């Protein structure tokens, strides 16, 4: 797969990045190099390799699913500048 100049401009537009015409050829080369590397990865033989989330074996840390006392509303809003009935009061932003 190859990226042309029009595709570079479109990607820049979608990403809301200002790209000058002088930068397009350089970015085109960079994107093509990245795609070539990804294509090389598809040639790697992964037969017999189990799917993994990390290169180092580790167990997911899980906590017990227990109900905690949630009656700490006073502590939650203690540092808020303005509250009412355990709710944060904020300035109105939509008219």
Swiss-Prot record:
Any single biological process term in GO: glutaminyl-tRNAGln biosynthesis via transamidation
Keyword Ligase on entry: yes
Protein origin, superkingdom: Bacteria
EC number: 6.3.5.-
Pfam families: GatC (PF02686)
Membrane-spanning segments: none
A single GO molecular function term of this UniProt record: glutaminyl-tRNA synthase (glutamine-hydrolyzing) activity
Keywords, in A-Z order: ATP-binding, Ligase, Nucleotide-binding, Protein biosynthesis
Claim: NADP is one of the keywords in the record: no
Reaction equations catalysed: L-glutamyl-tRNA(Gln) + L-glutamine + ATP + H2O = L-glutaminyl-tRNA(Gln) + L-glutamate + ADP + phosphate + H(+); L-aspartyl-tRNA(Asn) + L-glutamine + ATP + H2O = L-asparaginyl-tRNA(Asn) + L-glutamate + ADP + phosphate + 2 H(+)
EC supergroup of this enzyme: ligase
Subunit field text: Heterotrimer of A, B and C subunits.
Family: Belongs to the GatC family.
Function of the molecule: Allows the formation of correctly charged Asn-tRNA(Asn) or Gln-tRNA(Gln) through the transamidation of misacylated Asp-tRNA(Asn) or Glu-tRNA(Gln) in organisms which lack either or both of asparaginyl-tRNA or glutaminyl-tRNA synthetases. The reaction takes place in the presence of glutamine and ATP through an activated phospho-Asp-tRNA(Asn) or phospho-Glu-tRNA(Gln).
Name listed for the protein in its UniProt record: Aspartyl/glutamyl-tRNA(Asn/Gln) amidotransferase subunit C
